[in-house]
Amino acid sequence: MLALDRVGKTYPNGVHALARFSAEIRQGEIVAIIGGSGCGKSTLLRAIAGLDPASSGSVRLDDIAISAPHEKIGIIFQEPRLLPWLSVADNIGFGLSELPADVRRERVAKALARVGLADKAKAWPRELSGGQAQRVAIARALVPQPEVLLLDEPFSALDAFTRRDLQDHLLDLWADTRPTLILVTHDVDEAVVLADRVLVMRPRPGRLFETISINLARPRDRNSELFDHFKRHVLTSLDRSLDRNVLDAHGRSDEGGAMWW
């Protein structure tokens, strides 16, 4: 269980990025975080990762306080950040040095197959397309089998076809060990196709506005009426999260201790 308890973040320049953000995320759950620009999505993700600890409140994984990077938590950024002097296979196996060589090779080979790059094991990062490089980054993050994997808009720089392809590969890899996935995205379609729950954030400072459960079996049909229903629900919530009148009312209820679930 990942528990976020009234997480807040204020920077030295006085910018109040997050306020009293609380949520509980179950092991193996996929959660998407969505909201308007400047609502603190990436700030929240960095606090969960321990890269930029919260100013107030707490982040706890299995009752362990997280205030610095932790071996049980992995993260994928928008840019793949591959090591250019290592082959694709060595990039994927980079975090497995403590494992026996045969176990390491088996995990890397399985991950390469899962992301459709079995024929690229000996290639160099410079020889890959943007989509291929991000597949390697996903495989590299998942082969150490973290309990939690954080994804900060990992597909936003890719074309629509490649983005959908990588979403499918991500779900294939997730199904092997079922870590908790927390995805920051601006893409409503992506949130609905991947997530068990969507957390909609309100801005300035960032707070939880609404939690939407996506009650759809996988694999999900993007053309179904139910899929469209959940997309409309998320879009409506996003619109309301940016409506000043709604925010004022929501802010008053926050002061009284109410929560939106």
Predicted regions and their residues:
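Conserved ABC transporter NBD signature motif
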Residues: 57-69
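Helix-to-loop junction immediately C-terminal to a conserved catalytic motif
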Residues: 49
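The feature captures the beta-strand-to-loop junction immediately N-terminal to the Walker
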Residues: 34-36
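Conserved ABC ATPase "signature" region
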Residues: 102-120, 172
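Conserved signature/switch motifs of ABC ATPase nucleotide-binding domains
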Residues: 123-126, 144
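Short coil-to-helix segment of the ABC ATPase nucleotide-binding domain corresponding to the Q-loop/switch region
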Residues: 86-93
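Hydrophobic anchor residue at the start of the ABC signature
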Residues: 138
